[in-house]
Amino acid sequence: MEVQPREIRRYTTAEGRAPFTEWLDALRDRNVRVRIKSRLDRVEQGNLGDFKSVGQGVFELRINYGPGYRLYFGQVGLTIVVILIAGDKSTQEHDIRQAIEYWTDYEKRESTDK
């Protein structure tokens, strides 16, 4: 099976906010930021690792470290991954709902831009 490299994009709201970037920048633990960025590097190389669908086109990428970090993303075709939002196990339900809202918004705005 051939590995498919992926381009990572970060979701931005209509108001110009980047929820994932804001979350990542707010992390105080530098080691956590390094682990998350390393995980995203592997995604770019085509290795999604531990992930699952959470519904409506949104996927959860799990990072088994600390409180159980999760990154939520949508995928455009086979090669583009759009990082929507992130959190940990304690905020999982809220984060999934928010990620689905962001993904719906992303798809809606992308379809009107064409």
Model-derived features with residue positions:
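Basic, Lys/Arg-enriched alpha-helical interface segments
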Residues: 1-67, 77-81, 88-114
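Short, surface-exposed beta-strand/loop micro-motifs that present aromatic residues
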Residues: 70-74
